[in-house]
Regions:
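Extended, Lys/Arg-enriched charged tracts that mediate electrostatic binding to polyanionic substrates
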Residues: 140, 147-202
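Composition- and surface-driven signal marking solvent-exposed, interaction-prone regions
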Residues: 169, 240-241, 249-253
Length: 368
């Protein structure tokens, strides 16, 4: 048990590997939107001081100058390709509705209207989030790795080369499930979907027992079929086991009705659910249905490759994400984004991006 762990006092131990969370933009970048000296100038006025006179007039003039500088900084931030790419992953709709109009705005000619202040605040909101909030998302919220080493005294950081060591685009599990449901609706695919017995069904010598129910006698043929429903055998394989006289599809339909088995194309939980689905489709024994099912998946995978190729180019990324959603809707006939709610897990879009931070951190004995 001691291998791979760090001992603490008493019986406590820690795993020697740790995840390092942080932002993908420099933390001090947030100070760009804090005009130097403005807060100190405002502090000169107490709660009972009259907001008038020469001193107040000077502060108003300073505030106007600071606001103009902050707006210029916000425009420079919004023009950055990495910033717009990060926003594209979060909410690409605001790129056209807010970011683009803000970049086309000239404070010297149009003035700081309410609408432009709202857009400036939106840029500031995203910039603060990207600089100082430890989101775990894409290149603007990468996750790194570190380790405990009690032989060292403090904290050691190896910065690596660049902010991220690697980035990858993954399918959301729900989007693969939606694709599996659509493919499973094809009657030609179902015989090649392996049924499995549900976990709470217990098989006895000549009966089936489920929780809170008395044993239910079943025919030997049904009991044998239940034993064979292990999630690996297709209908043709089950038919070979039971012989030509058994009506396996009818028996399976009855077991589904009794809720003793699950008979559908299921995708196990996995960081790469698309690979699990592809492996299941490649096991379809008939060339026609197999090719048709894989063609649907290939069409979606081709669109996802476009997202990978876009990387941090905001224009290409927006086009690629749009293409993924349009392809997904056409192939699955399902919505390309899940509505946010208290029961919705992270990953509401069809695909998401994760990145690994280039830096590596070592925590020494003084930290413990």
């Amino acid at each position: 048990m001691s291998e791979g762990t760090v001992s603490l006092s008493g019986r406590w131990r820690l795993w020697d590997q740790v995840a390092v969370r942080g932002t993908g933009f420099p933390a001090n970048g947030v100070l760009r939107l804090a005009p130097e000296g403005l807060a100190a100038a405002a502090d000169k006025f107490g709660p009972r001081d009259a907001l008038s006179g020469a001193a107040w007039k000077a502060f108003e003039e300073e505030f106007v100058r600071a606001a103009a500088l902050a707006a210029a900084d916000a425009q420079e931030i919004a023009a950055s390709g990495r910033f717009r790419a990060a926003v594209a992953w979060q909410n690409r709709g605001v790129l056209d509705s807010a970011i683009r109009p803000f970049l086309n705005w000239s404070p010297e000619t149009a003035g700081r209207t309410f609408k432009q202040r709202q857009r400036e605040e939106l840029v500031a909101h995203y910039w603060q989030r990207f600089c100082v909030k430890n989101d775990t998302i894409g290149f603007f919220g990468p996750v790194g790795w570190g380790a405990f080493d009690t032989a060292r005294p403090g904290v050691t950081v190896e910065p690596g080369s660049g902010p991220t060591a690697s980035s990858e685009v993954f399918w959301s599990s729900w989007s693969v499930d939606a694709l599996a449901r659509e493919i499973d609706a094809d009657p030609a695919v179902r015989p090649w979907t392996a049924p499995r017995r549900v976990p709470y069904v217990r098989l006895e010598e000549n009966a089936v027992r489920i929780p809170a129910r008395p044993p239910r006698p079943v025919p030997p043929e049904t009991l044998r079929l239940l034993r064979l429903c292990d999630g690996t055998r297709s209908v043709p394989a089950l038919q070979r086991e039971l012989g030509p006289d058994a009506d396996v599809p009818a028996l399976l339909d009855e077991l589904v009705r009794l809720r003793w088995i699950t008979w559908r194309l299921e995708v196990p939980a996995d960081i790469r659910p698309d690979r699990r689905l592809r492996a299941a489709l490649e096991r379809i024994g008939e060339p026609g249905p197999r090719a048709a099912a894989l063609a649907r998946m290939d069409e979606l995978e081709s669109a996802v490759e476009g997202v990978r190729a876009a990387a941090e180019d905001p224009e290409r990324l927006v086009a690629a994400l749009t293409a993924v959603e349009q392809t997904f809707q056409r192939v699955t006939e399902a919505a390309a984004k899940r509505e946010k709610s208290t029961t919705t897990a992270p990953g509401r879009a069809v695909v998401y991006s994760d990145s690994r931070r280039a830096a590596r951190v070592t925590l020494g004995g003084d930290v413990l």
